């Protein structure tokens, strides 16, 4: 086998196993993949939480909040957590402000707004609304979200709800 043929075979094998970006994960494609996920946080217009999550999340999906080291949960728990937002923050909205694609990772900077229907994380109901920033790092595998690292500025949101 010639060196050229050998390198062509090696290059083809590497390309088949390359990260999503090398295979063409563009910002529009990333938005197409993550869009249904973020629609779930727009409580007023969202669809069936379980069906959408099963459509866009891998079976072994992990959601890692970063609030406690190593704290991650799977797709079934994520379905429950997201479903509960409709009760606690019935007008919740997630507005995507920026999307960056790096390899198989999609970084999303968003703004979350809402008005709690009752007590939220120990803060009594005040009727006030909040606005906070959220940052997510999504790992994409086979056209689905496989892992999410997310951080929301709940401290800011709770401060707004407590303000006089």
Predicted feature residues:
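Exposed beta-sheet edge and beta->alpha loop/turn motif
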Residues: 114-141
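Low-complexity, intrinsically disordered terminal/linker segments enriched in charged
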Residues: 23, 146-164
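Sec/Tat signal peptide C-region and signal peptidase I cleavage site
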Residues: 18-22
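Bacterial N-terminal signal peptides that target proteins for export
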Residues: 1-8
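Short N-terminal segments immediately surrounding and downstream of signal-peptide cleavage
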Residues: 23-39
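A short, structured loop/turn motif at beta-sheet edges
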Residues: 99-107, 139-146
């Amino acid at each position: 086998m010639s060196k050229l043929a050998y390198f062509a075979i090696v290059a083809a094998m590497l390309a088949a196993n390359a990260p999503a970006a090398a295979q063409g994960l563009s910002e529009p494609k990333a938005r197409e993949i993550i869009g249904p996920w973020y629609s779930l946080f727009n409580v007023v217009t969202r669809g069936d939480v379980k069906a959408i999550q099963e459509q866009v999340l891998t079976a072994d999906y992990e959601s890692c909040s970063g609030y406690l080291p190593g704290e991650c949960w799977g797709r079934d728990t994520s379905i429950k957590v997201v479903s509960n937002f409709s009760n606690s923050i019935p007008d919740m909205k997630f507005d995507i402000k920026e999307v960056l694609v790096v390899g198989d990772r999609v970084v999303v900077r968003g703004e979350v707004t809402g008005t709690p229907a009752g007590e939220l994380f120990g803060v009594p109901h005040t009727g006030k609304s909040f606005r906070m920033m959220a940052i997510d790092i999504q790992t994409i595998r086979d056209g689905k979200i496989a892992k999410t690292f997310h951080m929301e500025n709940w401290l800011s949101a709770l401060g707004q709800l407590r303000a006089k």
